[in-house]
UniProtKB/Swiss-Prot annotation:
Gene3D superfamilies, per database record: 3.90.930.1, C1 set domains (antibody constant domain-like) (2.40.128.160)
Residues anchoring lipid (S-diacylglycerol cysteine): C17
Keyword ATP-binding: no
Any single Gene Ontology cellular-component annotation: cell outer membrane
Main localization category: membrane
Membrane topology recorded in Swiss-Prot or TrEMBL: Lipid-anchor
Signal peptide boundaries: 1-16
Residue positions bearing lipid (N-palmitoyl cysteine): C17
Record keyword Membrane present: yes
PROSITE patterns on file: PROKAR_LIPOPROTEIN
Stated name of the protein: Outer surface protein B
Length: 295
């Protein structure tokens, strides 16, 4: 009888030990299941459901559009922007003229608007008090305009053109005035200046020569050069072919051509008469090379 009870006690002890040893593993298993569930839920947000169609937009963004209209006769839209899930509606199943919105963890609001022709997508962020903080406007031509705000007022702006050159404004007092303006062309060549009355004036200075790019409100470009030297002063002419012809002592010396892709080329005239271009135009690869061309 004692042996029977001893054996019975031993079995219970073994069961208790087994359960005790299994608990940490069980807890870990529960956590793994929970984490896996969260991951799957996040991944599922990035995929269309059976009731949705995937619509690709021009800037590599995607929206999910319901296959059927809701009770109000609208198509339901969904999108993920910087991990934030946005929801909204549109009249058409391509998402055009749709507006979506969603909240970040800090209660700031993100909205996404799609134009009627689907050529413009605007993403705007407002803080928890509904004050505008930032905006991005994507164009189908590949350009992007980014704005940031302080206390609801425009503070900085960056335009990335379709050719990937940029024009940046900072310390802005309003939409037409900025203390600092920087234009970056291909090969990292920077022109610096300011924005006054909607017109950007940007310069590169080399010794007595100042090369200026002037961009008006409509984006029209004019380039001119000023030389303060007392002798052998350089003069220039600017034409509609985006060519700046530099002359000295009454003879043409070189052409600087500002191409639409953001590059600058230089080509010299013959030194004897200054009437014939020699060789081929070469691309200016950096700021120092441009300054050399201005000498």
């Amino acid at each position: 009888m004692k042996q029977y009870l001893l054996g019975f006690t031993l079995v219970f002890a073994l069961i208790a030990c087994a359960q005790k040893g299994a608990n940490p593993e069980q807890k870990g298993g529960d956590a793994d299941v929970l984490n896996t569930s969260k991951t799957e839920k996040y991944l599922n947000k990035n995929l269309p459901s059976e009731a949705e169609d995937l619509v690709s937009l021009f800037n590599d963004s995607e929206i999910f559009v319901s296959k059927e209209k809701n009770k109000d006769g609208k198509y339901v839209l969904r999108a993920i922007v910087d991990t934030v899930e946005l929801k909204g509606v549109a009249d058409k199943n391509d998402g055009s003229e749709g507006k979506l919105e969603g909240l970040k963890p800090d209660n700031s609001k993100v909205t996404m608007s799609i134009s009627k022709d689907q050529n413009t997508i605007t993403i705007e962020t407002r803080d928890s008090s509904n004050t505008k903080v930032a905006s991005k406007v994507f164009k189908k031509d590949g350009s992007l305009t980014e704005e940031s705000y302080k206390a609801g007022q425009l503070d900085s702006k960056k335009l990335t053109r379709s050719n990937k050159t940029t024009l940046e404004y900072s310390d802005m007092t309003n939409a037409e005035n900025a203390t600092t303006a920087i234009e970056t062309l291909k090969n990292g060549i920077e022109f610096k200046g300011s924005l006054v009355g909607g017109k950007a004036t940007l310069q590169i200075v080399e010794s007595t020569v100042t090369l200026t790019r002037e961009i008006d409100k409509d984006g029209k470009l004019k380039i001119y050069l000023k030389d303060t030297a007392s002798s052998s002063k350089k003069t220039v002419s600017w034409n509609d072919t985006d060519t700046l012809t530099i002359s000295a002592e009454g003879k043409k010396t070189k052409d600087l051509v500002f191409l639409t892709d953001g590059t600058i080329t230089v080509q010299n005239y013959d030194s004897a008469s200054g009437t014939t271009l020699e060789g081929t135009a070469t691309e200016i690869k950096n700021l120092e090379a441009l300054k050399t061309a201005l000498k």
